[in-house]
């Protein structure tokens, strides 16, 4: 957006991303801090300044918003995901964008030690696998292992990001979302709406 504002290239561009749904006139925002919501919309608008069209990725169907030039399209699912054959395992598969969330996972594990948990994280000083006990392990991020784990899990738990939630839903996995910030609050509301 800023490149097109400052340098005005002659080549048109199209923005693609789930966040462009926030610009759609019919998108319903959660009842959250109005300043944060305004900043979210402002930042999203800034990334799309002078775009010829915005493709908003979503599982929900919505009519095009001609004023904001937003067209809602299905999510982009990686070929690696579409090639996987899902199975129902006995464990909850998870991803933590911040390894600090491990405390919350361990707290849950203390209350429900019988529930097998396999969470992926990006913790620089951790081993490839950090095994807490028989039913709780943390794994370093590895795309292939992560997707195989998702394909074989019983359910998926993560913050309410976009891509991995879409992949889990594509594979038919139940999803638990724990939003960590305003954009994820919006995603959570979107996923739970009809």
Predicted regions and their residues:
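An aromatic- and histidine-rich active-site surface loop
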Residues: 1-9
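Short, well-ordered alpha-helix to beta-strand connector turns
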Residues: 10, 51-52, 89, 153
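Hydrophobic/aromatic beta-strand patches that form the interior of the parallel beta-sheet core
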Residues: 14, 53-55, 71, 118, ...
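Short, acidic/turn-prone active-site loops that include or flank metal/cofactor-
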Residues: 18-22, 121-124, 142-144, 180-184
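A donor-sugar binding/catalytic signature common to diverse glycosyltransferases
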Residues: 145-187
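Conserved small/polar residues in nucleotide/adenosyl-binding loops
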Residues: 191-194
């Amino acid at each position: 957006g800023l490149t097109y504002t400052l340098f005005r290239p002659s080549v048109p561009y199209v923005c693609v991303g789930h966040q462009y749904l926030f610009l759609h006139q019919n998108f319903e925002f959660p009842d959250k801090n109005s300043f944060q919501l305004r900043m979210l919309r402002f930042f999203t608008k800034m990334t799309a300044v002078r775009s010829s069209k915005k493709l908003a990725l979503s599982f929900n169907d919505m009519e095009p918003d001609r004023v904001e030039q937003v067209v809602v399209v299905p999510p982009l699912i990686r070929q690696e995901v579409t090639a996987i054959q899902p199975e129902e395992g006995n464990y909850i598969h998870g991803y933590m964008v911040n390894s600090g969330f491990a405390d919350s996972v361990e707290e849950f594990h203390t209350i429900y030690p019988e529930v097998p948990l396999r969470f992926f994280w990006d913790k620089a000083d951790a081993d490839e696998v950090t095994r807490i006990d028989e039913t709780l392990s943390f794994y370093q991020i590895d795309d292939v292992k992560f997707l195989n784990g998702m394909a074989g899990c019983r359910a998926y738990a993560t913050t309410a990001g976009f891509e991995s939630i879409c992949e889990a839903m594509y594979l038919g996995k139940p999803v638990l979302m724990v939003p960590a910030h305003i954009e994820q609050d919006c995603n959570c509301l979107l996923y739970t709406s009809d």
